Regions:
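C-terminal helical cap(s) of enzyme catalytic domains, especially alpha/beta-barrels
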Residues: 145-150, 213-223, 290-311
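Internal, glycine-rich beta/alpha segment that forms the wall or movable "lid"
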Residues: 2-10, 56, 60-62, 87, ...
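A structural motif
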Residues: 42-45, 112, 201, 279
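Active-site mouth loops of central-metabolism enzymes
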Residues: 16-31, 90-98, 179-189, 252-265
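Hydrophobic faces of well-ordered beta-strands that scaffold small-molecule active sites
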Residues: 12-16, 48-50, 84-87, 115-119, ...
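N-terminal beta1-alpha1-beta2 module of alpha/beta enzyme domains
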Residues: 1-79, 182, 285-290, 294, ...
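Non-catalytic positions within long, well-ordered alpha-helices that form the structural scaffold/packing
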Residues: 41, 108, 272-276
Length: 316
């Protein structure tokens, strides 16, 4: 039976790769993602996240195709029972906003209320060009998309006509178990996007940081945006993405390793630093990149829970 993890100051998520070569140089198949999701449940992870990319094409590098994330999330929802599932993050420009809200509501139903909708404006222009999407005015398009997606998910209806998108007398029916409370994360770093976080999001995804200090460094802009919009920063959950590599005694870290790494005790101590700077949900790219990394990480989760329990017992 899957064990429900204890209440945590900072929840932990894992983000398996969907791109070619993303699993120790191999292309992940659905059976691999399914096995990793089920292993993550057993290990005590709180959430599992899948990316929303179509194609990676960088200069002087082999191009990498990606599986479609929402299709995989639907399948993962059917073979898991406890772990939360999310998009990290869905590019609103890849889909009609009203349809994206419908997809999120459907995933809410399939997962029995475990889905989290992570949203972003997209960034990798080559995949836009390859698949025929417009790359211009991404922030403006994103803002209009939110004006459709958020009312649909919250109130179940919207009537909107903008420069880029419209949804006239649109209703979202039937409704899933979250009943208008499906969590919405927004990934953002620039001032204009941060203002959209304050207006529409339940959680701010501060994107990727190798160390906790990276989160601390971006907080002033976040607080300024909150003040400008008039929202209490405490009402927005702080989330981040990072990297963790777990090695066994006698093993060495990869030469190009980034983020926090070492044996389980070192990784646990390093990750705890994210909780100390206010992160309440940390999404990780874990090395090794297959089920081995998840199984090794189970010990890290045990250590983090022990640290939290010990801290809670200390006087004062």
């Amino acid at each position: 039976m899957t064990q429900t993890p204890p209440a945590r100051r900072m929840r932990l998520g894992i983000a398996p790769a969907l791109e070619e070569g993303g699993m120790k140089g191999k292309t992940p198949r659905f059976k691999d993602i399914q096995a990793m999701a089920q292993a993550a449940e057993r290990a005590g992870f709180d959430s599992l996240w899948l990316e929303d990319h179509l194609l990676f094409r960088f200069p002087n590098q082999p191009e990498q195709g990606c599986w479609e994330g929402f299709t995989f999330l639907s399948a993962v929802a059917a073979v898991t029972t406890r772990i939360a599932l999310g998009s990290f993050v869905a590019a609103t420009s890849f889909r009609n906003p009203a349809l994206l809200a419908k997809m999120a509501e459907s995933l809410d139903e399939i997962s029995d209320g475990r889905f989290i909708l992570g949203l972003g404006a997209g960034w990798h222009e080559p995949e836009y060009t390859a698949f025929g999407y417009l790359f211009d005015h991404r922030a403006a398009r994103f803002e209009e998309a939110l004006q459709i997606i958020v009312p649909l998910l919250r109130e179940g209806q919207v009537d909107f006509a903008g420069q880029y998108y419209s949804a006239r007398e649109c209703v979202l029916r039937p409704r899933g178990p979250s009943q208008g409370q499906l969590p919405i994360w927004i990934g953002a770093s620039k001032p204009r996007m941060l203002r959209l976080v304050e207006r529409y999001a339940d959680a701010w995804n501060t994107v990727w940081h190798r160390q906790p200090q990276g989160v601390r460094d971006v907080m002033p802009e976040f607080l300024a945006a909150c003040q400008e919009v008039g929202r209490d920063p405490a009402s927005i959950e702080l989330t981040a993405g990072s990297f963790a590599e777990i090695v066994l005694p006698g093993e060495q870290r990869k030469p190009d390793a980034k983020g926090i790494g070492g044996q389980a005790e070192e990784v646990a101590a390093g990750l705890r630093g994210f909780a100390d700077v206010g992160v309440r949900h940390l999404v990780l790219l874990v090395e090794p990149e297959d089920i081995t990394g998840i199984e090794r990480f189970a010990r890290v989760i045990e250590l983090l829970d022990e640290m939290e329990a010990s801290a809670g017992q200390q006087p004062g």
